[in-house]
Amino acid sequence: DDGIIKNHKARSLSETNIERLQEIRLHGGNREMISEELQLECHKKENVSYTDTYGIIDPDKPAPTITSGCTIISKGRYCHPTQNRGLSIREAARLQSFDDKFEFQGNMGEMSLQIGNAVPPKLAQASGKVIINYMGLYEDYLEAQTKGVITP
């Protein structure tokens, strides 16, 4: 392990999107707090939903559902809690419980898709243990694990 955190790269933002984030931070909330001149035309219509677009992650609350748009600030509440940027690939992966040693391949869109479409590894592991236990094979699993045949 070389100590380098892989895939810790966020998408570049336009000056307009940086201004939007600054206004949201100043006024709190989400895209509804953006001044009219910075709002997208589609957001100016009445009864428009998806108010989480351009939303800032609250570090004191559970993370939003991680989707394939997890690095795009206009796709949901995917703005970094303290910095004017979206989530990096690594931050999104951590929210999905991927170990930092796991390295994603491809461009930003492909890596975001891999993360957003994945079953979180810790959820998969916990589910697998429940299924194994349910099937009455838990003892065999533990024995195989101690022999190094299966890793946790």
Where are these regions (language model features)?
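C-terminal target-recognition/interaction regions appended to catalytic cores
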Residues: 1-152
